[in-house]
Amino acid sequence: GKFDIYVDNKISSLKGLGLVGGAETKIMLKKRINSFPTMVFKTSNGGKLLNALGFTKNIKSGEMDININFLDNDYNYYKGQIKSKKFSVVNTPGIINSLSVLSFSGIRSIISGEGVYFEKGEANIYVKNKTFKFDKLYLSSDSLGIAAKGRLNLEKKSIDLKGSVAPIKLISRIISVVPAIGELLTGLK
């Protein structure tokens, strides 16, 4: 990897480009005097990055940006935002079985072993003691939209999410059949 380090009496920063878990990743770490550090990751393979960081092995591929604001000096408590594009959720039979009921394309990707594919994903997280609290989690694909909030405990390997799942194709058909709904939602005439 390649790194640049900057230090003065107000700020310390590290910027770098290297491989994290085999994924080319840009990293930026900043620490201002009298404040907690921030960290940014940008990668073309978010699955490999999340695996290397010890978060999950269940994401495959995907461009990903992770912005972290630490909330203590021990780096154990932080909030952040994760944005991802073009990724799959794999090896999660409970989630896959639930989603396959709503989406024919989901069934097709499960049979081929690719998991559930999403075009976009976004999550706001709060992490403390290996417990992730999601106050906003959005996932979307051509056929499926998910909005949720809840908790993920890495030590107990448990997840508790509440939210909604919508078959996007069905919503699109309803909007196209009833133009007034489309105008109401978009404001366009």
Enumerate the language-model features and the residues they cover:
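Membrane-proximal interfacial segments on either side of biological membranes
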Residues: 1-120, 124-132, 144-189
